[in-house]
Structures are given as structure tokens and as C-alpha cells.
């Protein structure tokens, strides 16, 4: 798993 994917996976907030 790349760091970008990990970062996206760590996003726990909902976009507007």
C-alpha cells in the first residue's frame, strides 16, 4: 500500500 492510499484511507472526515 502506498502512502497516498494510506493517507486517503486515513481520511475520516466527509467532504463538503
Swiss-Prot record:
Known InterPro entries for this protein? Answer: His_leader
Q: Which UniProt keywords apply?
A: Amino-acid biosynthesis, Histidine biosynthesis, Leader peptide
| S-S bonds | none
Which gene does this sequence derive from?
hisL
Q: What does this protein do?
A: This protein is involved in the attenuation mechanism for the control of the expression of the his operon structural genes.
Protein name per its UniProtKB record: his operon leader peptide
| Highest rank taxon of the organism | Bacteria
Task: State the family it belongs to.
Answer: Belongs to the HisL family.
GO biological process: what's one of them? L-histidine biosynthetic process
Q: Which lineage? A: Bacteria, Pseudomonadati, Pseudomonadota, Gammaproteobacteria, Enterobacterales
Amino acid at each position: 500500500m502506498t502512502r497516498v492510499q494510506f493517507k486517503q484511507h486515513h481520511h475520516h472526515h466527509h467532504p463538503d
